[in-house]
């Protein structure tokens, strides 16, 4: 499974996972602005934030099935477009209810990234590489957590939370295009028959 495509593929999926962590953490950072904008209590803010987690959790089994039937390229591209739509709607949300719906869309949209990425990386990297590449994926996701803390606070203070999320929505649209352009479900040399080692890893939950 040697290909010049696999590292660009990995980095696109890794940035996708970075965005997952960013969206997971960001409401806590912009909480004061959201409370002021929508005139809500801390409890209501928790409801708004939880919309992401509920939709994310509910979709884990469906996205696994879709990754098998559609493939990672189609699945992650489609769901990223949904996440981008959610971020853009959140940025222009006129009411608390609208903002909550937008957060549900974001959670729905980013739910496919991790499962689909593990599946595809198992096919593109050897068994000896898989543990290392999975760890690197998680590490890049951690950068998303960091970027949604202090850096996000500075950006929000400079441009406002609405402009910040408009930017995130736009960035997600670009990322969807990159995913479609770069990601391939199966390495070229395995397009007719998957290797026995890759199939074994998939059947054992992605373990090398």
Mark where each language-model region is.
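Cytoplasmic helix-loop-helix junction between adjacent transmembrane helices
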Residues: 102-141
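Conserved MFS/SLC helix-loop-helix module at the cytosolic interface between two early adjacent transmembrane helices
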Residues: 58-97
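Extracytoplasmic
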Residues: 8-42, 63
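Small-residue-rich segments within alpha-helical transmembrane domains of MFS-like 12-TM solute carriers
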Residues: 21, 25, 107-115, 146
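Residue-level signature of mid-helix packing/kink "hotspots" within the transmembrane helices
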Residues: 25, 53-61, 145-146
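Helix-loop-helix hairpin linking two adjacent transmembrane segments in secondary transporters
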Residues: 137-185
């Amino acid at each position: 499974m040697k290909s010049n495509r696999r590292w660009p593929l990995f980095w696109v999926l890794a940035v996708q996972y970075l965005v997952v962590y960013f969206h997971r953490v960001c409401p806590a950072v912009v909480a004061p602005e959201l409370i002021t904008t929508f005139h809500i209590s801390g409890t209501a803010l928790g409801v708004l934030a939880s919309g992401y987690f509920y939709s994310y959790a509910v979709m884990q089994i469906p996205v696994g099935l879709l990754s098998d039937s559609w493939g990672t390229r189609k699945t992650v591209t489609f769901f990223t477009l949904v996440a981008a739509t959610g971020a853009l709607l959140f940025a222009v949300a006129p009411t608390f209810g609208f903002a909550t719906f937008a957060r549900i869309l974001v959670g729905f949209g980013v739910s496919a990234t991790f499962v689909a990425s593990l599946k595809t990386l198992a096919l593109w990297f050897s068994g000896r590489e898989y543990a290392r590449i999975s760890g690197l994926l998680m590490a890049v996701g951690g950068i998303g957590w960091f970027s949604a803390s202090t850096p996000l606070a500075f950006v929000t203070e400079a441009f406002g939370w609405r402009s910040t999320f408009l930017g995130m929505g736009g960035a997600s649209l670009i990322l969807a295009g990159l995913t479609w352009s770069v990601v391939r479900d199966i390495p070229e040399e395995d397009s007719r028959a998957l290797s026995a080692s890759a199939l074994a890893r998939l059947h054992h939950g992605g373990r090398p």
